Amino acid sequence: MHHAIEYHHFSCQGLQAGNRKRTPVGQLLRITRGAALLRLGQHELLLQAGSSFWLCADALAAFSPLSGCEYDQLNVSLRLDQPQQAGWLEATPLLDALLDSQARWQRPQEWQGAYGQRLQVILDELQQCAISQQGYHDLQTRWQALASGQPESLQQWAQQADAPVEGLALQQQWQLLQALRLLKGGSKPAQVASKLGYANEAALQAACQQWGVSGDDGQ
């Protein structure tokens, strides 16, 4: 990190298969459009637009934005006071407004100027926010049913009035994400295709193209 606090905004044109790793900084992940998957410990959480999640430093996690996802990422150096547990962060209206303004920032991004001062205020506000281990219970229950392939889970997902992503799109990207993880682990494409229900290697490659996965991720 160049500075003690860094802000980034990302727009994902395709599925991004995040690597499972420990990061030596605290991270705030705030979804502003679409949805993302966060693998934390033994859990695979669905983060939807409007939700924020705090990852404490050195938490073992894999963050995988789905196609069309937009999100803010705030990195906080261990030199600074910050929350010590991971969980759903209940962002205050002020924190949301400050992060929205950072995404639209047009002036020079100078740490010693207004930009850096704004980041300091964001960190101060972040530390006032409550963090919960449980969040969006109904959504997570429906997501887990879909992820495990339970009967009628797709229909139940469609019954949500405010689903963050269309059910079939979520199901297909989850299937592909599992495939990409196996490929990164050294499994052969033919084995992966067979294990995850693809007709053949060509079908797996077609899924990569459909969801905008780069050649490097799809190997």
For each predicted feature, which ranges?
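…primarily DNA-binding HTH/wHTH and HhH modules…
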Residues: A202-Q219
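Ligand-binding loop in jelly-roll beta-barrel domains
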Residues: A59-A91
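Generic protein-terminus/edge-of-domain signal
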Residues: M1-A35
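Short alpha-helical "recognition helix" segments of helix-turn-helix
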Residues: P189-L196
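An amphipathic alpha-helical interaction segment
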Residues: A91-Q160
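Short acidic-glycine-tyrosine-enriched beta hairpin
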Residues: G41-A57
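Short, Lys/Arg-enriched anionic-surface-contact patches
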Residues: Q160-Q175
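Histidine-centered metal-chelating micro-motifs
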Residues: G18, F53, D58-A62
